[in-house]
């Protein structure tokens, strides 16, 4: 069985499959992805594969520099996005935006 390259919480699976979620914001541990990478995507909860994505762009961001566009690409409001990031990465202040398209 082939390993997944990146995982997402199951609650984001439907938005990714529908093309409503087109970025992910990660910490330094996942800052190595680069445009052109093709990644197998699994669910965080059970590592079950659900699609393949291609990385189209990467950039860095802080909570203070998040924009409404980032929120739109995550399919949530800016307030929701900041809250989710603080819940997942409570001790971090610098993040890595990975833009992608589903293949």
UniProtKB/Swiss-Prot annotation:
Keyword Hydrolase on entry = yes
Active-site residues, as the UniProt record annotates them? 21 (proton acceptor), 24 (nucleophile), 74 (proton donor)
Q: InterPro entries per the record?
A: AC4CH, ASCH_domain, PUA-like_sf
One Pfam family in the UniProt entry: ASCH
Q: Answer whether the UniProt record assigns the keyword Hydrolase to this protein.
A: yes
This enzyme's EC code(s): 3.5.1.135
GO MF entry, a single one: N4-acetylcytidine amidohydrolase activity
Write the record's keywords in alphabetical order, separated by commas. Hydrolase
Q: Which GO terms describe its cellular component?
A: cytosol
* Record-annotated ASCH domain positions: 6-100
Q: Which HAMAP family match?
A: ac4C_amidohydr
Give the similarity note.
Belongs to the N(4)-acetylcytidine amidohydrolase family.
What is the name attached to this protein's record?
A: N(4)-acetylcytidine amidohydrolase
Q: Which organism is it from?
A: Klebsiella pneumoniae (strain 342)
